[in-house]
């Protein structure tokens, strides 16, 4: 039987960290409660009595807090950062008292080498009301008097949005790509991260292909109006897995806006992707005809249905033994592109599954070459990739 509700309010409980059954206290992670946070995605540690009283913030500060609690539940190690701050670690007790700073990362050599932090931003969604939060990555030799092509790195979710709000080591799909002469942007969208709200998370239900697209297009339009160094006429898009699906869909839904895409390991047809994914995130539509007969529609719109819309430059990449997204997801798109008489490019990565292991560096340079050719007008000639050193940089980047 339900005894009582422990927490309430317009914020999100992410996970229970531990329960002190003797003192009847629960420690948990939550976000979007602290009014001083610059983004609702920042997680904090809290404690509250099981009867709902005594709610207390343990890890304050306008940061994303990664916490670890000792077995006695007396002490907490807090690793905190934003995308534009030096990561640091502090020790707290379970009452929220900061006992000491344990460590602060030394970025002196990075700064001497020219490193610059990415920049967080916020824009409005296509509804003109919902706030969206994102991160902008610039070349380290950025010149505000120049105009740069724009690349949108995407992941649709709906379990996350491919946007990091804490500091992470350089991501080849964002920071590193920007060093090739691009402004790279990532942002959330309605239907994305579950930590925003139930309404926000469910926005894409029943519309699994199209739901994030309008928000990204409108977000980029706002940024290009706000920042004159961003060229709205040279916009590319790329992503992996769900992001591969999304980047191709963007090219086909907004073919006059997105000019170039590198789409990697995309689940372009969610009717043949993992069955639970479509049923959970797209759902089953109940249809009643004029006679009162009920039928159920489980079909999900696909990218290959839109192949005839392609206008720009599309590079499709897939591992030939992908154990998450079957290569058939890309092949069906290829088939329809051929039938529609479209030019496109394709790279099959032999002997590789969903992530490309030692071929990740090759994938990175092919992506750089593709965007450089079609967004910057710079084409590498010859067969050799001069800077290539095969290796696996994938360490949890989505």
Labelled PLM ranges:
Residues 9, 38, 296-300:
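A conditional alpha-helix N-cap/helix-loop micro-motif detector
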Residues 26-30, 76-79:
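Residue position within the beta-strands of beta-propeller blades
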Residues 1-22, 31-34, 48-65, 94-126:
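Multi-bladed beta-propeller domains
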Residues 36-42, 82-85:
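Short, solvent-exposed loop/turn segments at conserved positions within beta-propeller repeat blades
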Residues 66-398:
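Serine-hydrolase catalytic core recognition
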Residues 28-40, 160:
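Short, conserved, GDST-rich strand-edge loop motifs in beta-rich repeat architectures
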Residues 41-45, 53, 87:
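Repetitive beta-architecture junctions, highlighting loop-to-beta-strand starts
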